[in-house]
Amino acid sequence: MRVRKRKGAEEHLENNPHYVISNPEEAKGRWHEIFGNNNPIHIEVGSGKGAFITGMAEQNPDINYIGIDIQLSVLSYALDKVLDSGAKNIKLLLVDGSSLSNYFDTGEVDLMYLNFSDPWPKKKHEKRRLTYKTFLDTYKDILPEQGEIHFKTDNRGLFEYSLASFSQYGMTLKQVWLDLHASDYQQNIMTEYERKFSNKGQVIYRVEARF
């Protein structure tokens, strides 16, 4: 979903280089150096306005988080949340999720999150879905052996498609939630969309898949 253009968004990002990495190609292979530690690195592709990535960073200070989004205005709102939180273990990237191997070395990312990705419901747009096989090729490259993807959505069609895509790729479905909020899963951090959809009574689906 597109967000209305935010005045001053570009300047906002430029004025916060500690959090927003302006030349991510130069960071490839150097992420631990950039964070200043050897803690695990988790990324969220399509981080939206930052509720999830910020909440995770606050909950897990010994993990480094990178929020990735292609929309300038959206990322500027995520930066607001990061600044408000004061978390030191977050970086933000304004890049396309299809080109992750340009920014991360092989095995450099320990775990990745896909939350409420665009379902692209039309068959002709299948290749744009973030769980399509060519995206999985990229994810596998930047994750370690047996690296994991944690995926959440409210869209049943996309969820079923993604389960099939993961399985056909040879991935292991570690755990599947058909109604996350009705489960006893305690570690959930909600995204903005998740809270909105949940308040409307929509079921939230989740899966942890391992290469």
UniProtKB/Swiss-Prot annotation:
Q: Where is the active site?
A: D118
| Species of provenance | Streptococcus agalactiae serotype V (strain ATCC BAA-611 / 2603 V/R)
Enzyme superclass (EC): transferase
Q: What is this protein called?
A: tRNA (guanine-N(7)-)-methyltransferase
GO molecular function (one): tRNA (guanine(46)-N7)-methyltransferase activity
Report any Pfam family annotated for this entry.
Answer: Methyltransf_4
Q: Which GO terms describe its cellular component?
A: tRNA methyltransferase complex
PANTHER family in the cross-refs: 3-DEOXY-D-MANNO-OCTULOSONIC-ACID TRANSFERASE/TRNA GUANINE-N 7 - -METHYLTRANSFERASE, PENTACOTRIPEPTIDE-REPEAT REGION OF PRORP DOMAIN-CONTAINING PROTEIN
The answer to keyword Transferase applying to this record is yes
**E.C. number:** 2.1.1.33
Q: Which reaction does it catalyse?
A: guanosine(46) in tRNA + S-adenosyl-L-methionine = N(7)-methylguanosine(46) in tRNA + S-adenosyl-L-homocysteine
Record's family? Belongs to the class I-like SAM-binding methyltransferase superfamily. TrmB family.
- Which residue ranges does the record annotate as region Interaction with RNA? 124-129
- UniProt key word S-adenosyl-L-methionine: yes
Q: Which Gene3D superfamilies match?
A: Vaccinia Virus protein VP39 (3.40.50.150)
Functionally, this protein is described as follows: Catalyzes the formation of N(7)-methylguanine at position 46 (m7G46) in tRNA.
Q: Which residues bind substrate?
A: K122, D154, T191, E192, Y193, E194
Alphabetical keyword list: Methyltransferase, S-adenosyl-L-methionine, Transferase, tRNA processing
Q: Which InterPro entries match?
A: SAM-dependent_MTases_sf, tRNA_(Gua-N-7)_MeTrfase_Trmb, tRNA_methyltr_TrmB_bact
Gene (UniProt): trmB
